[in-house]
C-alpha cells in the first residue's frame, strides 16, 4: 500500500507501507489554522480530531 505522508499543505510525498491495509488523514484546527497529518494505518484519535481512513493507494491526499 502506498500512502501520502506530507503534513498540511506541503508538496505531496508518499511512503510505501508494508503490511498495512489503511492510509489515514487526520485534521484539526488550532491557533496556526488547520493542521493535517497523513500516514499509514488507521490511528485512534482524540475527541475533536477528524479522521479519514481509506484502503487504496494514495487515497489519503
From Swiss-Prot:
Keyword Disulfide bond listed: yes
One of the record's GO molecular function terms: acetylcholine receptor inhibitor activity
Pfam family, one: Toxin_cobra-type
Top-rank taxon: Eukaryota
Coiled-coil segments on the chain, per record: none
SUPFAM superfamilies, A to Z: Snake toxin-like
Cellular compartments annotated: Secreted
CDD domains: TFP_snake_toxin
Keyword set, alphabetical order: Acetylcholine receptor inhibiting toxin, Disulfide bond, Ion channel impairing toxin, Neurotoxin, Postsynaptic neurotoxin, Secreted, Toxin
Major place of residence: secreted
Role summary: Binds to muscle nicotinic acetylcholine receptor (nAChR) and inhibit acetylcholine from binding to the receptor, thereby impairing neuromuscular transmission.
Name listed for the protein in its UniProt record: Neurotoxin 5
Lineage: Eukaryota, Metazoa, Chordata, Craniata, Vertebrata
Disulphide-bonded residues: 3-23, 17-40, 42-53, 54-59
Annotated family: Belongs to the three-finger toxin family. Short-chain subfamily. Type I alpha-neurotoxin sub-subfamily.
Cell membrane in keyword set: no
GO CC, one annotated term: extracellular region
Amino acid at each position: 500500500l502506498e500512502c501520502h505522508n506530507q503534513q498540511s499543505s506541503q508538496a505531496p510525498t508518499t511512503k510505501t507501507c508494508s503490511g498495512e491495509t489503511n492510509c489515514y488523514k487526520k485534521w484539526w484546527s488550532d491557533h496556526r489554522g488547520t493542521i493535517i497529518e497523513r500516514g499509514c494505518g488507521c490511528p485512534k484519535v482524540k475527541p475533536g480530531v477528524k479522521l479519514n481512513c481509506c484502503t487504496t493507494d494514495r487515497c489519503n491526499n
